[in-house]
């Protein structure tokens, strides 16, 4: 039985956001992408990029973009003659595992650029995103998980047979991945043997101890952890309870997976595509959820490899007919690089010509299930367009026999099917430059062959890496934090992560350090506090404004807008744009608010709101609805009536208490303004109760003729306890009403720190008091001793009539100097003893 593709050439509206990269394709020498000279030792006929054809402009370009096809900034000119439509294809997920923060870097950054083009420049962007649901990694993972599940079902307890199988799996894993260990290494000596043989790696050095560690050493550490975890499971004293069995399999899983596949992988009935689709559907759904949680816009069109089977076969067949691909006797089809480059205008490896001879990158691009050497390939660099399926691999009908598409051809076909013979933008992670994107370009240009050569993509955008404290995230190295893990732990949220990417730029790599996180948090707090201030003007208008500061703030406003515009036009320079926004807020904060019109404040705030929404920092909010602020700065709607009322009452009480004229008449006037006793809905009830309780407490204090201090203490209690516990804070300001705001993370952290300091002081005080009490108690006990008895110890053998020692224990006279010191101690004790007797 052959697993059939579902033919689908029409475009598909996505039900959910999909913006992922070829996730595991990242173990490589990244420096070579930026510095061609680093790979000068590789055999390659070309080291410079070929000419790029600039699109014809119908009007002046609005911006420049860094184009990987030229390694410089080019005017952005859409293909659309009217200059309105933009066709964009973005490489999407290979759905076999959860996405990590490195993937978030790619998709969120793609989303930022897409939003700027659409919402700032007004382009009508058609954004196409693919799902890779046929791939070597998917086949391997699906097969391995299927076999492990079957093995666990057949072995619900840890029997001797399971132990023996796991030991064999461990041996196979160590032999393949840790070659410095002896071939007969056993589980009992593994920890000591590995500590000796891989001491340099464990100590953070390279394997040979010369030079810094790299990906090779990172992989060795991963293999040491995997093997070590399996050893722990094998040596566990108890494996009898269901919990023990779960722990055993969890520790042994990573050595069992490849071993079971090596034994039984080829026996899998690959026509049962549920083996693979169970995996891909699960992780596509989880990926969609991750993207929603990161506030990434849905693609306009989603394509899946399994929905483009007929198109892929037709695409490959046309490349063969165009003379730039050939089939082999096993039913595979390879791209003919030599014949391709014989055609005028054709160039292989447009993006990274200096890497075209890198056999490691080529092998990565061909996939884990590809043969190391194919004798029928005309050139070692020729890459697979169609792979003949081996036993245990899914297969599709084709003119060349049962097989499956190569990785690179999938994107070429899907992008061409939706966007046609040419697109404006193609994007993805920097790791995909060579060979994936270079192969995409070559095979697509071979398909759309034109006189003088085709230019399938006009602008190639590659997102920089993400590293955390120097370590690049990689699934192959198992050193990643998944998106859902980071969000659920509270390490990040959609806004904080996006701010980091905005501050770091899109093209260069970003390293998240403590300082970088602090900068992102500070920027967010700065903008949030600005929004608080301006939104407060809606409740407390500045009616006495003299407008003397308007001109200065408006001048700064215009300057900031120009800086932001210039920055975005300069290849989406978001770091500069972010600095311009915070600089505008600084100028606003320095202005004398008495001399600033509310209308100017609102204009500045609306602009900043529009920009942060364009950047995707405020959920799905419309950048052009005229709103002010972003999510998180409002108190609940049900709270507003009662909280603003109690805040006004509190302001008046404090004002009168401070000046000393808080009479009963004044208090009655204040309380009578708001009635908290009326019936409330359930959501409003807690806030109404706060207002009611405050009014009752005011009346109680008034009836007792309490001093002003008690009223001020009550006002503090309202702020610090009653409202705080409901997530609301009243920020007292000099000569202005209190500002009502929600309790946010910054406020909570400040209070936690304040309380921690107070606790430390209280604990230190208590310790001092305890030590003082102990000291006093010790002195009290000491005072009870008669000075005549204090030296009657074994240290001495004779004393005078006052109890002072005259002979030591050996009968020798006590030295005069010693006697003098003893006399002082005796006199001190005599005084204490006399005071004790008096007491």
Task: List each language-model region with its residue ranges.
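Active-site neighborhoods of enzyme catalytic cores
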Residues: 43-56, 63, 130, 154-248, ...
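Alpha-helical recognition segments enriched in aromatics with Gly/Pro capping
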Residues: 43-96, 111, 282, 286-294, ...
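N-terminal alpha-helical targeting/anchoring segments
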Residues: 2, 38-43, 95, 113-126, ...
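Basic, alpha-helical terminal appendages of large translation-related enzymes
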Residues: 2-73, 79, 153, 242, ...
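Short glycine/proline-rich turn/loop motifs
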Residues: 91-93, 262-271, 389-397, 560-564, ...
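Short, well-structured beta-strand/strand-turn elements
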Residues: 123-126, 322-329, 726-732
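Catalytic adenosine-cofactor/nucleotide-binding cores of aminoacyl-tRNA synthetases and other
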Residues: 179-180, 184-214, 250, 449-451, ...
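N-terminal catalytic cores of NTP/NDP-binding nucleotidyl/phosphoryl-transfer enzymes
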Residues: 60-143, 147, 212-230, 248, ...
């Amino acid at each position: 039985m052959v697993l059939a593709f579902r033919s689908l050439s029409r475009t598909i509206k996505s039900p959910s956001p999909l913006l992922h990269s070829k996730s595991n394709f990242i173990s490589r020498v990244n420096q070579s992408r930026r510095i061609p000279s680093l790979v000068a030792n590789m055999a390659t006929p070309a080291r410079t990029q070929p000419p790029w054809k600039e699109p014809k402009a119908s009007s002046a370009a609005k911006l420049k973009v860094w184009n990987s096809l030229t390694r410089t900034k080019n005017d952005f000119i859409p293909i659309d003659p009217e200059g309105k439509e933009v066709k964009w294809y973005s490489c999407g997920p290979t759905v076999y595992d959860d996405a990590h923060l490195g993937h978030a870097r790619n998709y969120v950054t793609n989303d930022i650029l897409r939003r700027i083009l659409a919402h700032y420049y007004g382009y009508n962007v058609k954004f196409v995103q693919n799902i890779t649901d046929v791939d070597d990694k998917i086949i391997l993972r699906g097969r391995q998980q299927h076999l492990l599940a079957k093995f666990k079902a057949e072995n619900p307890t840890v029997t001797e047979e399971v132990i023996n199988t796991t030991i064999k799996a461990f041996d196979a894993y160590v032999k393949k991945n840790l070659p410095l260990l002896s071939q007969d290494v056993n589980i009992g000596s593994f920890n000591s043997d590995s500590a000796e043989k891989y001491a340099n790696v464990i100590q953070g050095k390279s394997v040979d101890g010369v030079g810094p560690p790299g990906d090779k050493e990172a992989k060795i550490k991963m293999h040491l952890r995997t093997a070590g975890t399996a050893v722990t499971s094998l040596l566990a004293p108890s494996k009898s309870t269901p919990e023990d069995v779960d722990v055993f399999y969890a520790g042994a899983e990573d050595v069992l997976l490849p071993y079971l596949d090596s034994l039984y992988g080829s026996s899998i009935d690959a026509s049962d595509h549920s083996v693979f689709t169970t995996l891909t559907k699960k992780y596509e759904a989880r990926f969609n959820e991750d993207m929603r949680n990161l506030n990434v816009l849905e693609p306009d069109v989603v394509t899946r490899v399994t929905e483009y089977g007929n198109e892929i076969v037709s695409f490959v067949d046309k490349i063969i007919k165009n003379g730039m691909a050939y089939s082999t006797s096993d039913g595979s089809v390879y791209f003919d690089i030599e014949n391709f480059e014989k055609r005028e205008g054709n160039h292989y490896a447009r993006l990274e010509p200096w890497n075209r001879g890198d056999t490691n990158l080529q092998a990565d691009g061909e996939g884990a299930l590809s043969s190391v050497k194919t004798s029928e390939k005309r050139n070692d660099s020729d890459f697979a367009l169609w792979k003949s399926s081996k036993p245990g691999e899914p297969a599709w009908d084709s003119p060349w026999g049962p097989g499956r598409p190569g990785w690179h051809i999938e994107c070429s076909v899907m992008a061409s099917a939706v966007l046609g013979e040419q697109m404006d933008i193609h994007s993805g992670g920097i790791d995909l430059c060579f060979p994936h994107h270079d192969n995409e370009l070559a095979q697509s240009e071979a398909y759309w062959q034109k006189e003088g050569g085709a230019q399938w993509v006009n602008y190639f955008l590659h997102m920089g890496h993400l590293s955390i404290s120097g370590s690049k995230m990689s699934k192959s190295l198992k050193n990643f934090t998944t998106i859902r893990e980071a969000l659920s732990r509270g390490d990040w949220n959609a806004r904080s992560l996006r701010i980091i990417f905005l501050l770091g730029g899109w093209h260069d790599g970003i390293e998240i350090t403590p300082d970088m996180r602090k900068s992102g948090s500070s920027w967010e707090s700065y903008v949030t506090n600005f929004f608080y201030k301006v939104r407060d003007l809606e409740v407390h208008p500045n009616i006495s404004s003299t407008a003397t500061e308007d001109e200065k703030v408006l001048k700064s406003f215009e300057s900031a807008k120009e800086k932001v515009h210039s920055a975005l036009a300069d290849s989406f320079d978001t770091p500069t744009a972010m600095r311009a926004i915070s600089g505008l807020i600084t100028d606003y904060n320095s202005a004398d608010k008495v001399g600033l019109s509310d209308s100017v404040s609102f204009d500045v705030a609306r602009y900043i709101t529009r920009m942060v929404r364009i950047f995707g920092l405020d959920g799905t909010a419309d950048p052009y609805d005229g709103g002010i602020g972003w999510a998180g700065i409002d108190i609940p709607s049900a709270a507003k009536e009662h909280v603003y009322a109690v805040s006004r009452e509190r302001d008046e009480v404090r004002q009168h208490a401070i000046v000393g004229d808080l009479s009963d008449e004044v208090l009655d006037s204040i309380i009578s303004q708001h009635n908290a006793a009326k019936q409330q809905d359930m959501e409003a009830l807690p806030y109404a109760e706060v207002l009611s309780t405050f009014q009752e407490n005011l009346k109680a204090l008034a009836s007792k003729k309490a001093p002003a201090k008690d009223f001020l203490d009550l006002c503090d209690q309202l702020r610090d306890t009653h409202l705080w516990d409901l997530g609301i804070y009243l920020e007292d300001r000099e000569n202005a009403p209190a500002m009502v705001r929600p309790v946010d993370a910054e406020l909570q952290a400040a209070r936690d720190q304040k309380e921690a300091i107070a606790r430390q002081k209280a604990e230190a005080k208590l310790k001092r008091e305890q030590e003082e009490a102990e000291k006093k108690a010790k002195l009290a006990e000491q005072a009870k001793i008669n000075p005549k008895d204090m030296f009657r110890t074994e240290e001495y053998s004779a004393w005078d009539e006052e109890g002072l020692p005259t002979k030591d224990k050996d009968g020798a006279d006590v030295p005069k100097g010693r006697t003098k010191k003893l006399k002082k101690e005796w006199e001190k004790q005599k005084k204490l003893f006399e005071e004790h007797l008096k007491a």
